[in-house]
Regions:
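N-terminal transmembrane alpha-helices
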Residues: 12-44, 48-52, 65-80, 84, ...
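Small-residue hotspots at the loop-to-helix junctions and early N-terminal turns
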Residues: 54-65, 144, 203, 276-291, ...
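Transmembrane alpha-helix boundary and packing residues in multipass membrane permease domains
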Residues: 28, 32, 44, 83, ...
């Protein structure tokens, strides 16, 4: 029998559902916020480079679609394997959970190496296709080349941390990111300014930091404190299991890869209608969105192992409680954020640039982009429930529906209508949040919520749940 290092269970079917979610969400939110700082701190420093801050910041923004591809594959395996892992823990099948962990690790490493090679070969045509100009390409290329050389560490730290959190070790998961982020914050000014490496220094600091995070995550999962350990013998790929991991993680993959598609559409359209200035504006807005979205990501990510465990344990009432709690927290938070961004846009913009032209252009754009921000939380809550319960098709559909069917076409179309120009690009986001968020949440209520009610009634009456 594979070695299991810890007999503790972290049983999510006991105690308050809200308490279980918050116990994971607080450290996970801090961890994700710190993780966002990897790239956001880079942008804060790069936005203050002497003489070329605008072009450097815009060039860094042009790399986002490719960085999103790396994140997408980390999500594909990490967020595909961890819900399966949680369900098997809920069922008490520790051996199967260990195999899921090992297969996921193997997929992360193999794919990370392959991505490094492919993206290094294709980086030049991709960056120009994504909206680079001759003025901004050198900055984008300098950052991306170094980042890609360490992308396997990014994938391991992101993907394996899902399994640390899924075992209930939220604080340890937070430390995975904290170790790297603190290193990044310390190294950034040294590499960027003291050593004069500019954007290349920012990339090198990020990759060295992700390396430390990856080492920490793997060391914990190999150690005695893990409930279910990462064993080399569990890494032999099982085709059927790989398909299950990919199928369930595909929604998270689609969410990240469609981020890349949307970013490409935005950057190329903004380049046509507003030039490098508005590509820089979008870089700032994306940076603000990443920071303020972190708490919702933390809550919905924390809710997934709790809901998945209770679903596996046939505690359907507790699954419903998890959905309600997640929804309330996310809607209240995003409404508050919307008001803050509307009232104090210059404060948030000023974190990333001191250039007056960028700041003046960014204020009205931010007002448009974040209008009705609270509707995004409904999409997050609905998809979180679908992923937690293994409903990959439903989660994938709504990822595609909002970003590919609504956002991307509107981004390309609206600038040509009613003289909207660049404002049309920013207007596509709130429209998609209202339509996509509403449709996703209503569908969740009509499918998952109703099924939980039916299974709970069958359980109470002594029938086998269908």
């Amino acid at each position: 029998m594979p070695h299991m290092a810890n007999t503790q269970t972290n049983d999510f079917s006991k105690g308050s559902v809200a308490g279980n979610i918050l116990r994971l969400a607080l450290p996970m939110t801090v961890a994700q916020l710190i993780n966002v700082l990897y790239s956001v701190v880079d942008r804060m420093y790069i936005g203050r480079l002497p003489d070329a801050a605008g072009n450097a910041l815009t060039g860094l923004g042009l790399t986002f679609p490719i960085l999103s591809i790396v994140t997408a594959f980390a999500n594909l395996f990490g967020m595909g394997g961890s819900p399966l892992f949680s369900i098997q823990r809920g069922k008490g099948d520790r051996d199967r959970a260990q195999v899921i962990l090992g297969n996921t690790f193997a997929l992360l490493v193999g794919t990370g190496v392959a991505l490094t090679v492919v993206l290094l070969v294709l980086k030049r045509p991709l960056l120009y296709a994504f909206g680079a100009s001759d003025a901004t390409y050198p900055y984008a290329d300098g950052y991306l080349t170094i980042y890609l050389l360490g992308s396997v560490f990014v994938m391991i730290s992101l993907g394996m941390n899902q399994f640390i959190n899924a075992q209930g070790f939220g604080r340890t998961g937070m430390l995975t990111v904290l170790i790297g982020a603190v290193t990044n914050i310390l190294l950034d000014p040294v590499f960027i300014f003291v050593l004069g490496m500019g954007v290349q220094g920012a990339a090198l600091a990020t990759i060295l930091s992700q390396f430390l995070s990856a080492v920490w995550a793997v060391s914990f999962l190999r150690g005695k404190k893990a409930l279910i350990r990462l064993e080399w013998g569990s890494m032999r790929l099982q085709p059927k299991l790989v398909w299950q991991i990919v199928s369930l993680g595909f929604s998270s993959f689609v969410m990240a890869i469609t981020n890349s598609i949307v970013q490409v559409a935005c950057n190329s359209t903004l380049q046509s209608f507003g030039g490098d200035l508005y590509v820089g504006v979008m870089t700032i807005i994306n940076s603000v969105r990443e920071v303020v979205s972190t708490p919702i990501n933390g809550v919905t990510s924390a809710a997934q192992p709790v809901m998945g465990f209770n679903y596996g344990a046939q505690e359907y009432r507790r699954v419903r409680s998890g959905i309600v709690f997640t929804t309330i927290v996310c809607v209240v938070y995003t409404t508050a954020v919307w008001l803050l961004l509307f009232l104090f846009p210059r404060f948030f913009i000023g974190l990333f640039t001191g250039e007056e032209a960028l700041r003046e252009a960014a204020v009205p754009s931010m007002h448009i982009y974040f209008f009705g921000f609270f509707m995004m939380s409904l999409q997050m809550a609905g998809q979180s429930a679908a992923v937690a319960l293994g409903r990959s098709k439903q989660a994938v559909f709504f990822s595609l529906f909002r970003k590919v069917i609504i956002v991307t076409p509107l981004t390309l179309l609206l600038p040509h209508l009613f003289g909207l120009g660049v404002n049309g690009v920013f207007l596509a986001e709130p429209i998609s949040n209202f339509i996509g968020g509403g449709a996703c949440y209503i569908t969740m209520l009509l499918t998952i919520w109703r099924e939980m009610n039916r299974k709970e009634k069958a359980k109470l009456s002594g029938e086998a749940p269908q």
